[in-house]
């Protein structure tokens, strides 16, 4: 791209045109359409649904005492070993009740393709795509294998008893050493030569709408043992079973599913995959390879979309950015609380003059003129806190400036540089790695480690220890991959120019977007 090309608010000419809707694999909304479809759902919803729901609940609760009986009286030492060959009559009863419960939900028959390998051949099963809370029906087809679940689920009636029943592997988010223990337990069971039951994983780690495969987490692949990929398909005319992070709620999915005469389900066992030496040493590489195999079999894209915490993210180059930027949510709640964008420039001037840097909750409320405690708490908690519990008011000012649709992308990039750059010994203002990370963290929520990779790439061809304003603006406005963040992703919804960031299927930049193919950004 030559220096003569314009770098204003709209961006390069090839990006002009009508606004497109960003693809979100964590979103699914379904409503019955047409008179006959609506009539069928409402008629069956008031007749078939209550009966099915009641019967399914009865069979679910019947499992409770039976599951508890299997582990009753066993010591912790006995439970640390496999009990798959003990009290097998109870295993068969739970299997029968589980299948009957799903039958009552509408899963009258299941089409099975391929052959499930024994535990000695494939100790781990990986299932995808994970698109609904009905997916655990696959455990019935797989003869009730162990699963990996949160330790908090032990306190849920029935569910906790079933987790103990099949000796599930439990992980605690509060215990820092829990994940290490889980890895060790998975390795122990995976290398037991079939003594333990198979362990079943949903490697995506969360539900998607089934149109793509989400990024596989490496947990199922750390042991480096063979795995058997298992595909799930719901070849129904209406996508009623899908339950995602955003969209139809639990009750609505239950109602839509159980208000149909029956639900089609196909489960396909692919051949056992044996990892290479390189994949055994690198769980992430192993996970990516298995994801590609399953995506090809499903004829669906293998993507890098994932859920981090409670935020769905998408990769843009080395960065991971929220699919639905939270900065617009902050703008909305502040506007409802009476905050006016007219005061933003005054706050920015305070930061540029060095008058206001780090603030606490009360001082933030005073600066913004917002008295509602719940509102100011939500705003405060969005930003990164230092060891003393304070936040950087420069980040607040930048996020507020991004809300202004009259400010061009280039102006926003220059403001970000002015707020976070520092003067070096030679009197030059440069943006350091920390300042660069703070900008991307505040506006797109990108972790510092990922921002550091991008910063290192940008500084590869310069002798300076940072980016000049010209270098940063070129990154924000002209970089073949990352320019989409400032030109479109960070344009306020009211500007009418919001577009999805330029995403490659594998999450990276294409060959022409490789930093080595750019001129240096000094």
From Swiss-Prot:
Keywords assigned by UniProt, alphabetized: Acyltransferase, Endoplasmic reticulum, Glycoprotein, Lipid biosynthesis, Lipid metabolism, Membrane, Phospholipid biosynthesis, Phospholipid metabolism, Transferase, Transmembrane, Transmembrane helix
Gene3D superfamilies noted in UniProt: EF-hand
One GO cellular component, as annotated: endoplasmic reticulum membrane
BP GO terms, sorted: phospholipid biosynthetic process
Encoding gene per record: lpcat4
Ranges annotated as biased composition (Polar residues): 503-522
EC nos: 2.3.1.23, 2.3.1.n6, 2.3.1.121, 2.3.1.67
Main localization category: endoplasmic reticulum
Subcellular location: Endoplasmic reticulum membrane
InterPro entries: EF-hand-dom_pair (IPR011992), LPCAT1-like (IPR045252), Plipid/glycerol_acylTrfase (IPR002123)
Name the UniProt record assigns to this protein: Lysophospholipid acyltransferase LPCAT4
CDD domains associated with the record: LPLAT_LPCAT1-like
Record carries keyword Transmembrane: yes
Catalysed reaction equations from the record: a 1-acyl-sn-glycero-3-phosphoethanolamine + an acyl-CoA = a 1,2-diacyl-sn-glycero-3-phosphoethanolamine + CoA; a 1-O-(1Z-alkenyl)-sn-glycero-3-phosphoethanolamine + an acyl-CoA = a 1-O-(1Z-alkenyl)-2-acyl-sn-glycero-3-phosphoethanolamine + CoA; a 1-acyl-sn-glycero-3-phosphocholine + an acyl-CoA = a 1,2-diacyl-sn-glycero-3-phosphocholine + CoA; a 1-O-alkyl-sn-glycero-3-phosphocholine + acetyl-CoA = a 1-O-alkyl-2-acetyl-sn-glycero-3-phosphocholine + CoA
Pfam families to which the protein is assigned, alphabetical: Acyltransferase (PF01553)
UniProt function note: Displays acyl-CoA-dependent lysophospholipid acyltransferase activity with a subset of lysophospholipids as substrates. Prefers long chain acyl-CoAs (C16, C18) as acyl donors.
Short motif (HXXXXD motif): ranges: 130-135
Residues bearing glycans: 166, 517
């Amino acid at each position: 791209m030559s220096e003569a090309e314009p770098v204003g608010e709209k961006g390069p000419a090839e990006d002009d045109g009508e606004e497109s809707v960003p693809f979100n694999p964590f979103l699914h909304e379904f409503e019955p359409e047409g008179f006959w479809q609506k009539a069928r759902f409402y008629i069956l919803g008031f007749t078939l649904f209550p009966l099915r729901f009641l019967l399914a609940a009865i069979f679910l609760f019947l499992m409770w005492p039976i599951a508890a009986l299997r582990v009753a009286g066993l010591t912790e030492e006995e439970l640390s070993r496999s009990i798959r060959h003990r009290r097998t009559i109870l295993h068969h009863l739970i299997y029968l009740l589980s299948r009957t419960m799903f039958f009552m939900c509408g899963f009258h028959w299941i089409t099975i393709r391929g052959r499930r390998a024994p535990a000695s051949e494939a100790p781990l099963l990986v299932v995808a795509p994970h698109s609904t809370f009905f997916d655990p029906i696959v455990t019935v087809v797989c003869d009730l294998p162990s699963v990996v679940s949160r330790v908090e689920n032990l306190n849920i009636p029935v569910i906790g008893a079933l987790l103990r029943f099949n000796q599930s592997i439990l992980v605690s988010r509060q215990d820092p050493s829990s994940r290490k223990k889980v890895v060790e337990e998975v390795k122990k069971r995976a290398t037991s030569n079939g003594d333990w039951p198979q362990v079943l994983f949903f490697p995506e780690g969360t539900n998607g709408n089934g149109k793509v495969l989400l990024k596989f987490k490496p947990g199922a692949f750390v042991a480096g043992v063979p795995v058997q990929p298992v595909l799930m398909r719901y070849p129904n005319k209406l996508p009623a079973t899908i339950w995602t992070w955003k969209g139809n709620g639990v009750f609505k999915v239950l109602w839509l599913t159980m208000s149909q005469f029956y639900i089609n389900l196909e489960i396909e066992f692919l051949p056992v995959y044996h990892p290479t030496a390189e994949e055994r040493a690198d769980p992430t590489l192993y996970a990516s390879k298995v994801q590609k195999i399953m995506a090809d079999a499903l004829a669906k894209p293998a993507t890098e979309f994932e859920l981090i915490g409670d935020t769905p993210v998408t990769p843009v180059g080395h960065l991971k950015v929220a699919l639905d930027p939270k900065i617009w949510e902050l703008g909305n709640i502040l506007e409802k609380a009476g905050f006016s964008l007219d005061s933003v420039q005054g706050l920015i001037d305070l930061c540029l003059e060095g008058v206001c840097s780090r603030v606490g909750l009360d001082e933030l409320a005073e600066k913004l003129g917002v008295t509602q405690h719940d509102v100011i708490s939500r705003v405060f908690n969005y930003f990164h806190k230092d060891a003393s519990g304070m936040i950087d008011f420069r980040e607040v000012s930048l996020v507020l400036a991004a809300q202004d649709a009259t400010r061009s992308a280039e102006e926003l990039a220059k403001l970000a540089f002015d707020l976070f750059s520092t003067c070096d010994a030679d009197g030059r203002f440069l943006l350091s790695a920390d300042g660069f990370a703070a900008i991307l963290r505040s506006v797109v929520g990108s972790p510092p480690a990922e921002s550091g990779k991008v910063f290192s790439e940008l500084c590869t061809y310069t002798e300076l220890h940072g980016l000049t304003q010209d270098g940063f603006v070129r990154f924000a406005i002209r970089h073949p991959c990352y320019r989409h963040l400032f030109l479109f992703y960070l344009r306020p919804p009211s500007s009418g120019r919001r577009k999805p960031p330029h995403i490659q299927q594998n999450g990276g930049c294409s060959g022409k977007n490789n930093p080595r193919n750019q001129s240096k950004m000094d």
